[in-house]
């Protein structure tokens, strides 16, 4: 934070807005407004200016001066809760650099204008310029923050398949009987395949264990021999995907 006695051109860090020419402050706020997505040619309806004493006492909440643009005059009372000031000064929506506190929704629903001493929804101290776009007196107050996206359409529900008969007695047609027999044959085929595959794995595991003992014996008898080329290693887990078939 800068020295209050400094004559820097950076108006965003000036502790007292009354010491800054309004044109300079308005131009600075306009640049911030346009950088944040505001219309490049539209004038600012109002400017919220942070009051930052030097040094900022610990725990002190930041207050803001409100200015009506482009008249070039500051409102006399600092606003400690600028996120609600738009209702009092006909600005439909603030356009802040930082996030707005959650308590603003409660005040917005009640339609109450903020008082100068109200600290219920004060934002943390921030040396930034705030701008509020589109202050038409007759315009309806808009919700603060980014527009909410439209809710996504719910996916269509799947139609449930009719229950398949579990016995020949439940079959109502020749087609149902044929499908039932095919399902029974398929289940038997899968069960037989899994049984044979499991038996193969057990035999291969025993063979792998025998190969390991033989490999160790050959290495002890002839250390220079490339045993792995003679007796290849067998993976510990065989056909795991097929077992889950």
Swiss-Prot record:
Subcellular location per the Swiss-Prot or TrEMBL entry: Host nucleus
Statement: the UniProt record of this protein carries the keyword Transcription: yes
Residue ranges, annotated region (Basic motif): 178-195
Residue ranges of domain bZIP in the record: 178-228
Region feature Disordered, mapped onto this chain: 140-167
UniProt-listed InterPro entries: bZIP, bZIP_sf, BZLF1_HHV-4
Inducing stimuli: Expressed in the immediate-early phase of the viral replicative cycle. It is expressed again during the switch between latency and lytic replication.
Region (Accessory activation domain): 229-245
Gene3D superfamilies: 1.20.5.170
Motif, Bipartite nuclear localization signal: chain positions: 157-194
Positions bearing Phosphoserine: 167, 173, 186
Record carries keyword Transcription regulation: yes
Keyword annotations of the record: DNA-binding, Early protein, G0/G1 host cell cycle checkpoint dysregulation by virus, Host nucleus, Host-virus interaction, Modulation of host cell cycle by virus, Phosphoprotein, Transcription, Transcription regulation
Site (Recognition of methylation): 190
Modified-residue entries (Phosphothreonine), positions: 14, 159
Domain of life the protein comes from: Viruses
SUPFAM superfamilies: Leucine zipper domain
Site (Recognition of methylation, required for disruption of latency): 186
MF term (GO), any: DNA-binding transcription factor activity
Location of the region described as Leucine-zipper in the Swiss-Prot/TrEMBL record: 196-228
Family assignment from sequence similarity: Belongs to the bZIP family.
Domain-related comment: Recognizes the CpG methylation marks through a specific serine and a methylcytosine-arginine-guanine triad. The leucine zipper region contributes to homodimerization. The basic motif is involved in specific DNA-binding.
Subunit composition and interactions: Homodimer. Interacts (via b-ZIP domain) with the DNA polymerase processivity factor BMRF1 (via N-terminus); this interaction may inhibit BZLF1-induced transcription of the BMRF1 promoter. Interacts with human UBN1, CRTC2 and RACK1. Interacts (via N-terminus) with human PAX5 (via N-terminus); this interaction inhibits BZLF1-mediated lytic viral reactivation. Interacts (via leucine-zipper domain) with host CEBPA; this interaction induces G1 host cell cycle arrest.
Protein function: Transcription factor that acts as a molecular switch to induce the transition from the latent to the lytic or productive phase of the virus cycle. Mediates the switch from the latent to the lytic cycle of infection in cells containing a highly methylated viral genome. Probably binds to silenced chromatin and recruits host chromatin-remodeling enzymes. Regulates this switch by binding to 2 types of ZEBRA response elements (ZREs): the CpG-free AP-1 like elements (latency) and the methylated CpG-containing elements (lytic replication).
Protein name, entry field: Lytic switch protein BZLF1
Lineage: Viruses, Duplodnaviria, Heunggongvirae, Peploviricota, Herviviricetes
